[in-house]
C-alpha cells in the first residue's frame, strides 16, 4: 500500500522496461522510502521532492513499483575499520539507548566535554548515507563504536574516532529508532514492524520477529531492554492511509510487545485499545468505517523499577469512537503487560489525514486536534526524593504526573499553540531540576495543502526550561528567524539532549545549537544545511534536523541531518563534533 501511494505520482510516466527495475529500486529507497515507509503523518511529501526528479528517474521508480521485484540496496561505501574486539563494557558513560537511561531523561552525566568547551566544538568527521534524501535516525554510542540506522534500512556500526565502517546490516525496511546495545547484542526495529537482534561486534543476524501483522504497523520508536526482556513500541501508518475516501478506516491498534532477548519469542502483547475494531457507519461514498482504532506508541517505553511499571505515551484515535486510552500516558506491569492506570489528557481526539486535505470524506465527523504524545515520558527523581513523570504533548502542553499515585496530574504548563505538527513532537530532556522542551509549532501557509503550500517561516520554535517540581517556566530561548532560506522553519521538532550545563537541540532550519541550562543563552551554533566532505567519499549534505536527537559520549557529539518530509530540507549525513575537532 505504501509503494502504491508513491506509484500514483509517477505511474503515468511508466513504460514496460524491466531493465529499469534495479535502478528504480535504488531510487525508491533513496527518494521515496523516507516518506512512504516513515512517519504516519508524512505519507505525502512536498511537491518539490517528486517534481525535482528527472523524467527517467520517475519512469525507473514506476517500473520498480509495478514489477515489485525485490532488489537489494547497496550500503554506503567507506573505509573499513581495522579488526578489533568489541567490548561494550569499555564505555564508562555510553549512550546505549534512545534516552540514555531507563528513565529516558536524555541526560549524559559524563559527556567527556565541559560546558566551557561547548563553544569550541568543531566537526570531527562526517559520514554520508549514499543516495538517500533523509537522515533522521537516533545514533547510539557504545564501546568506541557508533550504531545508527537509515531510511533505506541499512544499519551501520562505525568507529567513533574516525567514522570507519565495522559492519553493515540490511533490515527489511527503514530503521528510525535507536539501536539498543547490551553486551554483545544489538536490538532495533524497522518500519514494517519487525524487531531484530544482531551481534553487536559483527552485525550477524541472531533473530528477527514480526511484532504486528497489520499491514500499516511499524516500529518507529526505540525498543528498551530491562531485566531479560525487550520491550517494543508499535505504531502505524494507517493514520495516513486512512485519509483516502476508498479506504476502510481504521483497524490498527497501538501496542507494546515484550520479547525474550535471546530468542525473540513473544512473552506478552498489550494493545492500547482493548476492544477489537468493529464495523461502524459507512462514509459518504459507501466505504465501511471501523473503530475504535489508533493509539499508536511512537516512542521508547520508560522503565520504573521501583513500581515495576512501564510508561508509554499514546497517539490519537484514527476513527470514531475515540478510545479512552488515546492521547494518554499509560502505565503497564513489567511482568504481565497488564494496564495499571491511564491518564488521558485529550478526550475525543479522532483524526486522520483526510482532516488536513481538501477531501474530508474519511475525516471523523467530530474531528479531533491530533494531539498525540510523540515523546517518551521522563521519570525524574527530585532532590527531596519526590518523583515526577514528565511528558510533553502535541497540544504544546507539558504535564507532570505522580507515578506513585495512579498518575495523578500534578501540574501542566502550556508553551505554544500546538497542532498537527505543532506542540511538542519527539522528545525532551531533563537534568533532574528542569525539563528542557523543544517547541515545534511547525506551520504551513495553507493547512489543507498537505505540505505543498509552503512553510510559514515566521512561526514556531523556541526552547523552554520548565521546573520539574512545580511546572514553572524558568527561561525561554526564543527561535531564530529563517530569513530567506528555502524550505525553512524555526520549529524545534527533534528531541533535545542535556549534559551538565548545556542543552543540545537541532532545528528544522538545519541549525544545531547548544544552550546554557542556566539562562538559555546560545553557547554554540552550527548550520548543518550545507555540503560536507565525508570520510566514506559519499556526496552528502545536511538539512533539517528532525525525529532523531543528539547522542553524546566520549567527548563526541553526534547528530543526523536531513529531513525533507513536510517540505523540510533534505539531507543524508551523520555528523560528529568534538572539541577543536580532535
Residue ranges and their predicted role:
Residues 6-16:
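Bacterial N-terminal signal peptides
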Residues 79-124, 272, 276-277:
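Blade/loop signatures of beta-propeller domains
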Residues 29-39, 61:
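The canonical Cys-X-X-Cys-His
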Residues 51-76:
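C-terminal capping alpha-helices of c-type cytochrome domains
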Residues 15-27, 77-85:
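Electrostatic cytochrome c docking/interface patches
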Residues 41-51:
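Flexible linker/context regions in extracytoplasmic redox proteins
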Residues 115-130, 154-175, 180-188, 193-217, ...:
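Extracytoplasmic/lumenal domain signature
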Residues 1-3:
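N-terminal secretory signal peptides that target proteins for export/translocation
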Amino acid at each position: 500500500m505504501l509503494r502504491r501511494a508513491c506509484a500514483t505520482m509517477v505511474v503515468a510516466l511508466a513504460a514496460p522496461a524491466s531493465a529499469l527495475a534495479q535502478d528504480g529500486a535504488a531510487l525508491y529507497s533513496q527518494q521515496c522510502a523516507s516518506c512512504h515507509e516513515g512517519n504516519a503523518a508524512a505519507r505525502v511529501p512536498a511537491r518539490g521532492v517528486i517534481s525535482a526528479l528527472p523524467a527517467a528517474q520517475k519512469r525507473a521508480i514506476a517500473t520498480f513499483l509495478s514489477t515489485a521485484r525485490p532488489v537489494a540496496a547497496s550500503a554506503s561505501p567507506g573505509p573499513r575499520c581495522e579488526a578489533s574486539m568489541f567490548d561494550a563494557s569499555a564505555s564508562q558513560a555510553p549512550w546505549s539507548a534512545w534516552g540514555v537511561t531507563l528513565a529516558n531523561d536524555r541526560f549524559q552525566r559524563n559527556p567527556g566535554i565541559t560546558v566551557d568547551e561547548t563553544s569550541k566544538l568543531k566537526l570531527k568527521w562526517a559520514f554520508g548515507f549514499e543516495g538517500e534524501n533523509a537522515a533522521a535516525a537516533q545514533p547510539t554510542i557504545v564501546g568506541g563504536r557508533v550504531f545508527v540506522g537509515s531510511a533505506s534500512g541499512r544499519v551501520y556500526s562505525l568507529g567513533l574516532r574516525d567514522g570507519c565502517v565495522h559492519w553493515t546490516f540490511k533490515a527489511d525496511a527503514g530503521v528510525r529508532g535507536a539501536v539498543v546495545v547490551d553486551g554483545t547484542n544489538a536490538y532495533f526495529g524497522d518500519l514494517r514492524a519487525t524487531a531484530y537482534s544482531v551481534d553487536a561486534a559483527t552485525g550477524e543476524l541472531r533473530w528477527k520477529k514480526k511484532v504486528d501483522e497489520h499491514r500499516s504497523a511499524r516500529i518507529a520508536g526505540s525498543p528498551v531492554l530491562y531485566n531479560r526482556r525487550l520491550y517494543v513500541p508499535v505504531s502505524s501508518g494507517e493514520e495516513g492511509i486512512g485519509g483516502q475516501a476508498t479506504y476502510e478506516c481504521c483497524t490498527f491498534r497501538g501496542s507494546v510487545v515484550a520479547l525474550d532477548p535471546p530468542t525473540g519469542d513473544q512473552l506478552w502483547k498489550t494493545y492500547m485499545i482493548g476492544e477489537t475494531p468493529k464495523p461502524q457507519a459507512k462514509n459518504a461514498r459507501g466505504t465501511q468505517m471501523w473503530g475504535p482504532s489508533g493509539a499508536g506508541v511512537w516512542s521508547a517505553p520508560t522503565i520504573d523499577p521501583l513500581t515495576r511499571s512501564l510508561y508509554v505515551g499514546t497517539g490519537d484515535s484514527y476513527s470514531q469512537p475515540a478510545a479512552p486510552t488515546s492521547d494518554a500516558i499509560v502505565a503497564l506491569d513489567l511482568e504481565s503487560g497488564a494496564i495499571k492506570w491511564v491518564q488521558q489528557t485529550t478526550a475525543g481526539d479522532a483524526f486522520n489525514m483526510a482532516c488536513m486535505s481538501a477531501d474530508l470524506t474519511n475525516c471523523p465527523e467530530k474531528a479531533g486536534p491530533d494531539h498525540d504524545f510523540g515523546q517518551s515520558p521522563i521519570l525524574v527523581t527530585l532532590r527531596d526524593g519526590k518523583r515526577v513523570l514528565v511528558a510533553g504533548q502535541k497540544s504544546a502542553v507539558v504535564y507532570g504526573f505522580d507515578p506513585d499515585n495512579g498518575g495523578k496530574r500534578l501540574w501542566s504548563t502550556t508553551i505554544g499553540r500546538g497542532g498537527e505538527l505543532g506542540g511538542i513532537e519527539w522528545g525532551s530532556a531533563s537534568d533532574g531540576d528542569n525539563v528542557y522542551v523543544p517547541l515545534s509549532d511547525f506551520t504551513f501557509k495553507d493547512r489543507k495543502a498537505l505540505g505543498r503550500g509552503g512553510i510559514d517561516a515566521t512561526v514556531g520554535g523556541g526552547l523552554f526550561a520548565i521546573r520539574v517540581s512545580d511546572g514553572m517556566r524558568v527561561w525561554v530561548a526564543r527561535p531564530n528567524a529563517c530569513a530567506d532560506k528555502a524550505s525553512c522553519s524555526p520549529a524545534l521538532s527533534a528531541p533535545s539532549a542535556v549534559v551538565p550545563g548545556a542543552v543540545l537541540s537541532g532545528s528544522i532550519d538545519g541549525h544545531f545549537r547548544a544552550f546554557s541550562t542556566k539562562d538559555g543563552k546560545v553557547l554554540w551554533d552550527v548550520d548543518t544545511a550545507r555540503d560536507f566532505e565525508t570520510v566514506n567519499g559519499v556526496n552528502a549534505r545536511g538539512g533539517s534536523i528532525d525525529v532523531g536527537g543528539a547522542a553524546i559520549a566520549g567527548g563526541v557529539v553526534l547528530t543526523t541531518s536531513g529531513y525533507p518530509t513536510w517540505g523540510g530540507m533534505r539531507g543524508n549525513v551523520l555528523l560528529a563534533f568534538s572539541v577543536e575537532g580532535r
